[in-house]
Every structure is written in C-alpha cells, then in structure tokens.
Amino acid sequence: MADSDDEYDRKRRDKFRGERDSYRPERRDERRPMGGGANSRDEWSERNPFRGSSAAGGGGGGGARHRPDYSDYRGSGPRPRYGSPGREMPPAKRMRPDWGESEMRSNPRFGYDPYLVQAWNDHYQSLHSAYSHSSHPSSARESAPNVVNSDTQTQPAMLTLKQFLDTQDENISDSEVMRKYTEYKTDFKRQQLNEFFVAHKDEEWFKNKYHPEDSVRRSEEQRGFLKRRTDVFLELLENGTIGSVKVDSSQADSLVRVLDTCVIKLEGGTDEDLKILDEKPKETPVVYERKSESTEASVVAKREPESPKQTKSEKGADEEQPVVVSPQRKSLRPVNSDEENWDDENDEMAAPAKVQGDDDSIKSGSDKKLKKKKIKKRNRNSSDDESSSSSSFESDSDSDDEKLKAKYDVEEGLRADQKAEAQKDKEEAATVAKANPLPPDSPQPEGGTALQDAAAIKSEQSDEQQEKDAEQPAELQADEPAAAKNGEEPEKTEKNEVETKSTADDVTETIDLDKVKDGPQPRALHRTSSIFLRNLAPSITKAEIEAICTRFSGYLRVAIADPLVERRWYRRGWITFTRDVNIKEICWSLNNQRLRDCEMGAIVNRDLSRRVRPANGITAHKQIVRADIKLCAKIAMNLDERFKLWSEADSTQQQPDAESKPSADATNGSGGSSTTYGFNSKNPVLQNITDYLIEEASAEEEELLGLAGDNKDGEGEPIERDEQLISVLDRLVLYLRIVHSVDYYNHCEYPYEDEMPNRCGIIHARGPPPMRVTSNDVQEYIKAYDGKLQQFLTKSVQLSDDEIKELGAKNPETEVEKFVQANTQELAKDKWLCPLSGKKFKGPEFIRKHIFNKHEEKVDEVRKEVQYFNNYLRDPKRPQLPEHPGSSKRTESESGRGSGGYRPPMYPPFSAMPYGFAPPMMGGGGRGGRNFPPVRREMPLEHQRRLIGYHDLDAPVNSDMFD
C-alpha cells in the first residue's frame, strides 16, 4: 500500500512547489495548525490513527485536523515524504460518503475500532437477536434508515431447542427435554396472549370484538343495519327494480341507479327523493361556479324589470306554461351563455312590437354590447359583482333601450292583470280568515309550478285546520261571533290584510332562485362529502371524534377501521357530511386540532371514480353462470345463518307458503348440500334455486354422431349465454352486494359500509366476453373462483373449552377467589383490613362477606373480565402480534416432533451441528465445551422419524449417511 501511495504523490508532486509555498506568508499561515505552531511539521504527530477524535471525518487515520488531506482518507499509511500537507487540489476519490453515517452510531465503526469488532457485533446481533430476546434491531445504524420496519411489532424470539438445552442440566434425558420444551412453548404462547390482552383491553375496537357487553351491543347494531338493508332489497325486488337490471358492465348507468336508490332508501328518503336520480348529473366545474352564479342571480332578480332574468320569468307567466325552468337547470347554465343568449330570447318575445327598420341597428348594437360585456366580465372580481352588473346594464345602446321599452310596455298590462288577481286573492283570503284563525297563503301565478306546489301544501294545511275547527265544541264556536261583535272582527281583518300583503310580497320574492330552492325539492341523499383521517391512535374513541364533528353543520356519521399491526395499531377514519357543506374549511379546522396529542391527518376524501368496474367476461358463459349460482347460494345461506336474518320469527309474514313445497323436489338437486336451497331458508332469493342447478348436456347425441370433445378443447367454443340463468344469478349477486356488502365478482367484502361515506359505492360486473373459450379455461376459472371465495363459505367456529384451556383460559370462581384474597390484608393478630373500603375486621371471613355484600359490582367486574379474556381466546382469528421471523422458521423444524400438517424440516436433527460449521475436534467440544453424548445420539421411539436426505450433486457419495 505504501508503494502505491508514494507513486500517487510522485505523480502529483511539483518540483519547486515547496520552495514557492515557503515564501508565501499566507500559505504558511494556512499550513499552521489551529493550536499555533512554528512549523507545519508539528502536526505530523496528529497523524496517529489511534489519537483522533470521534468527530473526525477520516477513516482509520481520522485525526482532528483543520485541513483534511488525501493522506487523511487513506488510512494509517506512512506520511508523505514530499510536499505540503495543505494541498490545494482535491483528491481523486473521496471516501467520506461511505462513512457519513458514522454520526448516527453511538460508537464509530472506524477510528476507534480498527478491527471492526463493533461492526461485526452489530451485524451478529441483528441477524441473531434471539439470544438478546429483542424484537427490534439493537444497532442504531440499522434501525435509523428503516424506521418503518423497526416500528413493526413482533413477539420476542422464542428459544430454539439448542438454546433451551443450554439452560437445562446436562444429565437430562431426551424425553424430559422434549416435555419441558413443549411446556416452555405453551407457556410462551400463553404469556404472549395475556400480554396482548392486557395491552389492548381498554381500547374501543378491542371491546367491540370481545367485551361481553360492548360486543353484544355492536352485534345488535350491525344486525339492525342488515335488517334495514334487507327491507330495502325486498322493496326493490317487489317493485321490479332488481329484476330490470343486469350485472353487466354495459349497463353501468342502470347499476349505479340501483345502488343510489338503495342509498337514498337507507338514508330514510322517500319516492319524492328518488326524482333526483332523473336529473342530469352536475359536472364538477359547473358545481364550483354555482356559488357566484346564485349570488349574481339573486342580485339580478331584485333589480328593476329590465333584468333579463325577470323577463324570462315573466315570459313564462305570460304564456301560462305549466312547467318552469327549475333552479337546478338554471344553475347548470354558465354565466357567459346566460348573458349571450338573452338578446335572442328578447328578439323572439318583442317581435310583434318591433319596427322593421331597426333590425340592423339592433343586431349591430347587440354585437357591440356582447363584446363589451365579455371584456368587462374578464376584468371584474367576485367582490364587485353587483356594481359591475349594474354598469353593464346601464351601458346599453339606444336600440337596446327601444327594444326593452317595447317589451316592457307590452308586459305592463299583464302586470295590471296580475295585480287585479292578487287583489281578488286578498279579498278571498279575508273572507276565509273570518272562519279560520290562521289565514291561508295565496300563491301568485308568477311563481310557476314550484309556487303552485307550495300553495297546494298550504291549502291542505288550511283544510286540515278547518277540520280541526269543525271538531271543536260548540261553545268555542259560539264565542267567535260574540268576539266579532265586540270589535275584534275589524282588528282581525286588518291583521289578515297585513299578513296577506306580507305573504304576497314574499311570494313575489320567491321568484329568486334561492327562494325557490327553499321549497319542497328532492334531496340528493346519495351524495355526500367526506374527510379521511389517516392517523388515529388506538386510544381514541368514536365518541371523541363525534364530539368534535358535531360542532360542524351537516355532520352525518363517522367510520373507524380496525387497527393494523403494520401501522402500530393506528387506525383510519372517515367522517361523512352532507353535500352542501364547505368540506375544505372543515378539513382545515380539523387539521388545526389535536386529539389526545395525536395529529389526525385529515384530508378531503374524493368521490368514487368508477362505480361499476368490469370483471372477466368469461363469467357470462352458461357453465360458469351455473357454478356461480351454486356459489352465491352457499354464500348467501352462510351469511344469513351467521347473522340470523331469516329466522322463524322474522320470516313468518314474508314467506307463509315456503314450507308447503313438496319435499320430493329436493331430489332434483345436485348433491346433498343443494337440497337445503330454498327449503330451510326463508330468503325469497333462494326459493326454487335447485331448478337452476341441474346441468344439461346432449351426451347421447354426441355419442351417436361421434362428436368428440377434442375439437372443442383445441379450438374452443363460443360463449353461450342463458338469460334465464343470468337473471337468477344477477338477483343473487345484487342480494349479496346490497344486503351483505359482498362484491361477488371481486370476491371481497366491504366492511362497516353502513358507516362509510358511500353505503353502496362500488360493484364489479361482467365485462365484455371473449370470442371463444376452452373447457380447460372454464374448469380452471371455476376452481380458482371457488378457492377465492372460501372465506365466505367456511363457518366461523369458536374454540372449545378444552382448547382454550390449553391457551390459558381463566375460571371465574378462581379469579373471584384471587380478588378476595388480594383485598384481604392482615395487619396484626385478629386485625384484618379491606383496602376497598378501608374498614378493619377481626377475621378474613368477615372481609369475604363484606366484599360480596358491599362490593358486589367489583366482583361482577372480575367475572366480566374473565369472560372478556375467554372470548378473546375463543376467536380462532384473534388479533395478536406476529411471530418473530426466527421463531416461525425454527419452531417446528428444530423441535424434533414433526407434527402433521407441516413441511418436513430442512435442518439436521437437533443434536447435529448447523450447516457451515465444522464438527468439534474433541468428543466433548460441542455446546460450549460441555460433555454431551456423541452428535448422533438416539431419541425415544415416540420422537423418531424417517430422515429425509438432501444430496449435493458435487459432494462425494456417502452410502452410510442414513443407515
């Protein structure tokens, strides 16, 4: 290494450089060390690689120098013989980036550790952390870059059999070793389950799963959601909505309409609210312009009659059209198009009153005015809409004034007629008010159909009030004329006139879009706004989030997902609001709040992009459709039985004749499991389902004609659709999607969908079918789909008492006895204390009696806690920390038991040395020098198994390896 360094310095050396630098005072000052020395040679002593500080950036020779040099980076080599240490030119290759992470280490890898002992130790500990019983890497260097991986919680590593033998006596027998190791593994599992239960028993998500009271309440709530969904589905099934749609991607609009209908019904909507689905969907950019447009429309409607908005409404009143443009349609029209098109409408309205010679001037004036308006509209702001709109109307040309004047002169007579009709309505209202304490509101004809509907509702209310007044006693009715004689009648008529005037003014104001919107309009209950919460601590409850969200108007519900171990048991949440709220403002205010010192990470949740998504088109084939019907029926029966949807008490009214079907039809099914379809279940979707499960084939015809199936397998056959089977399958698929939130063609379930922003959001449908399909493809598809849906076919069976006893189940009476003993303290002879109340007794039996009488609620809490823990153990899919990677790989392989259901271990027997290590030189050299028997010691018969050989082709032949 020294020769190469010298060669490097020789090539870079300048012959007279040292002499030039010696006569430059500034360079001499730079060459001096910080401590101040007379000669640059004073710093040579600092080049000792073992005298540097930990802050040095160099490698093995990292001394604390003011100006690092190339020699600082090349290790503890000899110092250069020529040249100055303060070289200006940078080195050819700098090694510092490789050592930059040394600041993150408690002990630097280089400098103080020339033999890399610490680095080897870190690497050993990270790969073999089983000896330290740690679930995280012990090295700061390895844990710093991988923060996400280090946060993943796992169980501590379980001792391997080899490590467990190190803790036992050397004279222990093999059977005793295996017995103790089995007990160790059982105790280890019990301890992990108990620790996990204690860590999460106070969290809401855990209580909703296993607490004896909270879990029952949660299950009843979910069952209520399912019953509500079932009622909605039956309603849609009866009115033909379900039967009129097919689950094909080509009918995406119809499927979306069915899903939206379900959502509106689930939200408590009526048939009137379903009319919102007939309106055209509002595009996103138009929705953002609605706010400025509505304010502008209200300003225009309150102006003088030269407003174009007013002329349009008066035009509708003049022509007595039964339908008026709805406010939604007006809001969908852009502002520019509204101002550009009103001149053409005025031309049509004022055509009889026009002068023939003014046509050209009107057109030219209108064109100029349009150009001016467009320029002004680009320059104005939203704050001065009123002033700019007024200025635009005042800048009309003379021809426009004549045109508008002619138009409004025609309409003045109509206004006079309307005033006369209004006066008649006032007189009629005054006459009716004499008999009614509440005067009815008289609608104006200018309001169109929207106002007529409102007037009809008010008239119905007045009729109801009249009926109530007619039912009053005769004494109260006799008092009314007496009161009228005393002078109350003129006061009442004056009040009625004032009220009718105010109502008439209100009716004229309802021409505005905002006023019309306040009338009875269909509600878009299927559209919501929502906020997504990225981080929710496990300790945060749903009630705390609801307390924050109820302060905002339009709050509907909140949904919280189950925690994930990958996210350190943090959860995600969705907050749902109505569509008309300012969701961004609410999201901003939520981001400025912290709940239990946790940033929720609120962001605006976008709407669903594609609600109907295509699945494989091969699903439309007749054979696959029949297999899907069978699978859907099994899934529906399993889920109905799990939630007890169609029990005898709930279904007696819905299907009274279900049991009257002959049992002989059960033999028509394929297999014994198909006999339960439509007979044991009261579900109308499963009625007569066995008729569609019978497979049909022309086997005899093919045999007689000699038609072989080889040609079909090679070339394939076209897709065969059976519309009758497809209609049955679609009814089952929609039942699973609407009632149980199971997307069949996506083979998944959407959990807690009733609390999500979209209650029926996404559905997968059959895509476009291929041209041909082979029988092999059909069989593979059916088999693969059956495997994907096994999670819905398997029944959830809880563990038995014997099984949970092995996991450490607790006995309620035993735990109560422990509770009594823990609260019985002996102070002195014949002097005992109860810590629960602080009272003293003469004996423990008195404390026991006192606890059961005065602290019965504490005893009940102990019993509930025991049931709480046992419910957690009974769940076969209970949440728990994942096993340590080392434990999961070596637990069964090195135990020597070889239980069924596991792969055969790939390691040698537990007493053999691992691969890659040489055997001990002495007989007793194994396992730390202890005197163990030879490596190939015999095991008892119950633990012996056949050894499986793994031969290396390059290794020499060893014939007696498995003797």
Curated annotation (Swiss-Prot):
Modified residues (Phosphotyrosine): 82
Coarse class of the protein's main subcellular location: nucleus
Compositionally biased region (Low complexity): 73-87, 129-144
Compositionally biased region (Basic residues): 369-380
GO biological process terms held by the UniProt record: primary miRNA processing; regulatory ncRNA-mediated post-transcriptional gene silencing
Single GO MF descriptor: nucleic acid binding
Superkingdom field: Eukaryota
Stored InterPro entries: Nucleotide-bd_a/b_plait_sf, RBD_domain_sf, SE/Ars2, SERRATE/Ars2_C, SERRATE/Ars2_N
Stretches with biased composition (Acidic residues): 337-348
Family annotation (SUPFAM superfamilies): RNA-binding domain, RBD
Subunit structure: Interacts with cbp20, Dcr-2 and pasha.
Family indicated by similarity: Belongs to the ARS2 family.
Chain's role: Acts as a mediator between the cap-binding complex (CBC) and RNA-mediated gene silencing (RNAi). Involved in innate immunity via the short interfering RNAs (siRNAs) processing machinery by restricting the viral RNA production. Also involved microRNA (miRNA)-mediated silencing by contributing to the stability and delivery of primary miRNA transcripts to the primary miRNA processing complex containing drosha and pasha.
Record's protein name: Serrate RNA effector molecule homolog
